[in-house]
Amino acid sequence: MPRIIKHLGRVDYEPTWRAMQAFTDSRGAETRDELWVVEHPPVFTQGLAGKPEHLLQQNDVPVVKTDRGGQITYHGPGQLVVYLLVDFKRMHVGVRELVRRIEQAIIDMLAEQGIAANGDVDAPGVYVDGAKIASLGLRIKNGATYHGLSLNVDMDLTPFSWINPCGYANLKVTQMKNLGVNLTVAEAADKLLPHLERHLSTSKETA
């Protein structure tokens, strides 16, 4: 079944998260997968493993405790967020392979823009010369995923210095703009989505 792509624009984090939960709770065997393309106003989200000490500096950015995996991260304008509402039982792959495919989609998209990036088996996400450019966080429920990925496109990276991103002290972050690629979030989405569609194919051979 073809996936439904929804471009939702700039939306608040918490109601979007609640909508993902509701979608996942109500989906059935024939429900089509959806990819939600969004930006968020400034917000820190703290995953199930999140520890308060990873918020290093008090500030005006709200902190939302959420139900994805992982630690604390930052979302803000100029960052592409894609939520993956996927029945991964249909793909006949495990969670680790699903994460690898999402990472590879981002790596392939960045390569097209002349950016050499890589994953890290010990720390999910995508990195350029050791600096994180994309983060992943998923929740699995009844064989389906929600939450997803964030890719730094053209944003103010300062709030990342107020946290230990993803729980790692002194982790550097980067973005496409700093690497010489000037795209809007919408343009970055248009370039990433075909790679996501390909890597989320149900066929193991085509990923």
Curated annotation (Swiss-Prot):
Organism placement in taxonomy: Bacteria, Pseudomonadati, Pseudomonadota, Betaproteobacteria, Neisseriales
Catalytically driven reaction(s): octanoyl-[ACP] + L-lysyl-[protein] = N(6)-octanoyl-L-lysyl-[protein] + holo-[ACP] + H(+)
Alphabetized SUPFAM superfamilies for the sequence: Class II aaRS and biotin synthetases
Gene that this sequence comes from: lipB
Site (Lowers pKa of active site Cys): K132
Coiled-coil segments on the chain, per record: none
GO MF assignments: lipoyl(octanoyl) transferase activity
Organism encoding this protein: Chromobacterium violaceum (strain ATCC 12472 / DSM 30191 / JCM 1249 / CCUG 213 / NBRC 12614 / NCIMB 9131 / NCTC 9757 / MK)
Protein purpose: Catalyzes the transfer of endogenously produced octanoic acid from octanoyl-acyl-carrier-protein onto the lipoyl domains of lipoate-dependent enzymes. Lipoyl-ACP can also act as a substrate although octanoyl-ACP is likely to be the physiological substrate.
Annotated residues for binding of substrate: R68, G69, G70, Q71, I72, T73, Y74, H75, S135, L136, G137, G148, L149, S150
Record-linked InterPro entries: aa-tRNA-synth_II/BPL/LPL, BPL_LPL_catalytic, Octanoyltransferase, Octanoyltransferase_CS
Family: Belongs to the LipB family.
One Pfam family here: LplA-B_cat
GO cellular component: cytoplasm
Keyword Magnesium set for record: no
Signal sequence, start to end: none
EC number from the UniProt entry: 2.3.1.181
Cell location: Cytoplasm
Protein name in the entry: Octanoyltransferase
Enzyme class: transferase
Domain BPL/LPL catalytic: 29-204
